[in-house]
From Swiss-Prot:
It comes from Clostridium tetani (strain Massachusetts / E88). InterPro entries: PurM-like_C_dom, PurM-like_C_sf, PurM-like_N, PurM-like_N_sf, PurM_cligase. It is an enzyme of class 6 (ligase). GO terms for molecular function: ATP binding; phosphoribosylamine-glycine ligase activity; phosphoribosylformylglycinamidine cyclo-ligase activity. Signal peptide: none annotated. The gene is purM. This is Phosphoribosylformylglycinamidine cyclo-ligase.
Length: 331
């Protein structure tokens, strides 16, 4: 008699992976979580809000995964998955409430799946949200053995009156950039086209390890700022770099002027440029050292930068808003 295992799906390994994941998942639970692992759906209590708006976002990690496969390093890629989602919803002032993950692979290995979920759990702890559900799909013949894909879904909340939507951004406002931790989770197809040996030495470690540095999660420091300062707009610098992401936070009759020498550029970006990528194209693909941007009135600039530094972040005035046609000018 044929079995599911004969077809390439190991149910026992699935049970094993769930048991290994439980510890990591439960670490993220907070008072809003109403049920545990194993139910058909997850439930979350909102608590006391006057006029709440739910804010959602979904994303993956892209071809950064290919480097993780090659180095067999699985425990940080989940942080990237969380970061890509929670940083996006943060742009509208939302506090992340909960997160769900989806992982698919050709052949399930319990320890690897648990390692990946540990990263998701670590990311949720950094973001202050609960990992309340997920799906692990074993799909023989669909993925190569040793390869997998991961995606996530975040839901946050903000009082309607506190939504950050960029409507008040005007000429003369300034942009504050918060430093990234490295390349983050975008542009890896380009990276992989110019870097062929991920075990090459780079500043005392192999370059693959540098490229796997987890995406920074900006939730806690930015939510602290929102308690005290009126931030007009925010942008998460992801795919499309400065040119595509910064205009998403302001109106059509404005330009943003960025001073490219106003912040330090991590060595990894100089290394990628040395492989034959034009600098201007880099700003259209990568974060170039700035992972999150705030738009504020100039009177708050110094206080906000000081507050970010107090919280352990590196922050810089990187540009300003002027009249224009919704363009980004980098000079």
């Amino acid at each position: 008699m044929a079995t599911y295992k004969d077809a390439g799906v190991n149910i026992e390994e699935g049970y094993k992976s769930v048991n290994l994941m439980k510890e990591h998942v439960q670490k993220t639970f907070n008072k809003g979580v109403l049920n545990g692992i194993g139910s058909f759906a997850a439930m979350y209590e909102l608590g006391k809000y006057k006029n709440p708006v739910l804010v959602s976002g979904t994303d993956g990690v892209g071809t950064k995964l290919k480097i993780a496969f090659e180095l067999e390093k699985y425990n940080t890629i989940g942080i990237d998955c969380v970061a890509m989602c929670v940083n996006d919803i943060l742009c509208h002032g939302a506090k992340p409430l909960f997160f769900l993950d989806y992982m698919a692979c050709g052949k399930l290995k319990g320890e690897v799946a648990a390692d990946i979920v540990k990263g998701v759990s670590d990311g949720c702890l950094r973001a202050g949200c609960a990992l309340i559900g997920g799906e692990t799909a074993e799909m023989p013949g669909f993925y190569k053995e040793g390869e997998y894909d991961i995606a996530g879904f975040a839901v946050g909340i903000v009082e309607k009156e506190n939504i950050v939507d960029g409507q008040d951004i005007k000429e003369g406002d300034v942009l504050i950039g918060i430093a990234s931790s490295g390349v983050h989770s975008n542009g890896y197809s380009l990276v992989r086209s110019v870097i062929k040996d991920f075990r090459e030495e780079f500043h005392g470690k192999i370059i693959g390890e540098e490229l796997l540095t987890p995406t920074k999660i900006y939730v806690k420091p930015v939510l602290q700022l929102l308690k005290s300062y009126p931030i007009k707009g925010m942008a998460h610098i992801t795919g499309g770099g400065f040119y595509e992401n910064i205009p998403r936070m302001f109106k059509d009759d404005l330009n943003v002027v960025i001073s490219k020498n106003s912040f330090p550029r991590p060595d990894i970006f100089e290394y990628i440029i040395s492989k034959g990528i034009e600098e201007n194209h880099m700003f259209n693909v990568f974060n170039m050292g700035i992972g999150f941007v705030l738009c504020v009135d100039p009177c708050y600039e110094k206080k906000i930068i000081e507050k970010l530094i107090e919280q352990g972040e590196k922050a810089y005035k990187i540009g300003h808003i002027e009249k224009g046609e919704r363009k980004v000018i980098i000079k």
